[in-house]
């Protein structure tokens, strides 16, 4: 959490009481790689991903209300915050990416589908608990392995190479 935007987002999101809300993805793992590389902690962070899970209303309008709520609460941070209800992803994913996507049961299920195992990290906004089902060893060591739960070799290799282009010391296994 060396990135001050991460810390501030966690505080502000907690106050919004969004169900199963997690700060996740590049804003977390890139801070670790940036620290090791001597880069500013926010170097290369394009956006700040927020996953939540609310299956009580699966309409786009309901998700848009949460997106707007977060946008208003974080507007002064100067950071692009991407908010997605993981309960809805199966409704639009196949149409957008031409591949099926299972109906999820928890916000963490979305994190579990990341292509690179060590990037499967998130912070539960309500509890502050770190979710890292693969541990942190590979993340700290810069070892990129395919996620065994989502073994798409072509997409994994493209994503891993993209990371390695920015942090050349990363190793693809």
Feature locations, PLM:
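Catalytic cores of the polymerase beta-like nucleotidyltransferase superfamily
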Residues: 1-173
